[in-house]
């Protein structure tokens, strides 16, 4: 699957450094799994793990383009209870196709009495399934043009202000 990519595949983990104590140990596991995909992709897979709080432009892109938002997590201490807003999502993007895996897609919570155990679901399966969906959902311009019955004609309307200097002076345009 990763060996036949015609475009770069982006796997970006949005993980907050300040998060729920039960999620914190999972962040290195997610980063390690992404690195495995990067190695298997042999240059066609780009992986990133970012804390959106440190990168406001990536946070804005995540919120506006992909609907990724911080989730409120309740932290209960011995004498106090607090709520922390944290990111725990993975973006899978290939060409114009994208899928977001949010924390309910990534973790499994097992409660027994007063304690809870949080672990990653089968992240390799979930990531591979998402990659397969975006890769097979994407059609490159080459493949779209190859399916046309007749040659395509492209008409471009450009004002001289947006042309390179060499072409702007040409009166033939």
Feature annotation, model-predicted:
Residues 1-173:
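Short, surface-exposed patches at the edges or C-terminal ends of soluble domains, predominantly
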């Amino acid at each position: 699957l990763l060996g036949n990519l015609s475009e770069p595949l982006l796997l970006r983990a949005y993980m907050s450094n300040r998060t729920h104590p039960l999620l914190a140990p999972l962040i290195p596991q997610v980063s390690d799994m992404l690195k495995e995909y990067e190695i298997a992709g042999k240059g066609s897979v780009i992986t990133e793990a970012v804390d959106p709080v440190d990168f406001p432009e990536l946070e804005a892109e995540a919120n506006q383009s992909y609907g990724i938002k911080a989730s409120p997590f309740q932290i209960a201490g011995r004498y106090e209870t607090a709520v922390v807003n944290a990111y725990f999502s993975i973006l899978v993007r290939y060409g114009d196709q994208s899928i977001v895996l949010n924390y309910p897609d990534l973790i499994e919570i097992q409660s027994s009495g007063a304690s809870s155990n949080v672990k990653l679901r089968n992240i390799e399966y979930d990531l591979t399934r998402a990659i397969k969906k975006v890769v097979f959902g994407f059609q490159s311009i080459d493949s779209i043009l190859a399916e046309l019955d007749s040659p395509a004609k492209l008409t471009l309307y450009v004002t001289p202000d947006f042309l390179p200097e060499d072409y702007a002076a040409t009166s033939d345009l």
